[in-house]
Amino acid sequence: MAKSSLDKKFDKIREREESKSFSTKKRSRIVSKFVNNRLAVFGLIIFSIILLATIFAPLLSPYDPMRVDLRSMRQSPSLDHWFGTDNTGRDVFTRVLFGGRVSIFIGLGSAILSALVGIAVGCYAGYKGGWIDLIALRISEIFMSFPQIILVLLLVSITGQSLFNLMAIFILTGWGGMYRLARARMLSLREEEYVQALRSFGLSTFTICYKHMLPNALSPIMVNITLSTAMFILTEAGLSFLGLGVPLNIPTWGNILNVAQDILVLQNYWWMWGPVGVVISVFVLCVNFIGDGLRDSTDPSQQG
């Protein structure tokens, strides 16, 4: 006897549940492929070292990052001050560690929060379609039609300088890319048979979108978050170098670089800006290595 339509739908759900073991094997292959990527592993190791160094900064340096010591102004690197001191005698190594806390918090926090906004809107709009999708798409197009740095500069001049204002601006200008990524994935998945079966059983839109469909889009989302983290860290550094980012009384990698605006410092006191410039470059490079590793390991065309 031929199966009824209801039985076929049950079969689709059952196949979906049975595929979990396959998904576990697939995740194992992804991890194995990532581990075999030397650049990705190298990036992850250096990323972890820098991150842990910033977290445990008080244990690694006896100095206060904001303490002024006029007797130690502009000292070159030594055993007492590994990266030297700045114009007011503050230890540069300490400021790089504590500044990394803020810069990484801004970059990673903005990337994750903008991703959450983009995912929430993109999944719902892509699944439901209609006027909700149209409005969300047009709003994202408005934000993405401007060069991001110009839009950020404009919004900073309106809202003023503060750490959380800058993060809010990054989220506002950065959610569009993740929205379009999530939306495209939902558009391709919503006609799948298992989604139609779930819909026929009366499951809520939230359950279908975020519990059953979203896990299939996590791979490109993770890659996008890593790349956004690097972009936001570089943007913060550039804005703070210009004096338009985080207030100067808060140590960040960009604020430490700010001293390089002085041609005297640029030419004669390389330790005030050189080490932090290297740290920014290495950290962003490692984040990009991690992103490339995630992309390669999750690319279906390269799966064995």
What are these regions (language model features)?
Residues L155-I158, F170, R185-M186, T235-V279:
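Glycine-rich helix-loop "coupling/hinge" segments at transmembrane-helix boundaries
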Residues R90-F105, G109, G129-L137, R190-E191, ...:
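Amphipathic cytosolic juxtamembrane alpha-helices at the membrane-cytosol interface
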Residues M1-A115, I119, W131, G245, ...:
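Gly/Trp-centered helix-boundary motif
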Residues I45-I46, S103-G118, S145-V156, P215, ...:
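Hydrophobic alpha-helical transmembrane segments in multi-pass membrane proteins
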Residues G118, G122, G202, P215-A217, ...:
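Conserved G/P- and acidic residue-centered "switch" motifs that form tight phosphate/ATP-binding loops
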Residues W82, L116-G118, G126-L189, M222:
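Generic hydrophobic transmembrane alpha-helix motif, especially the helices
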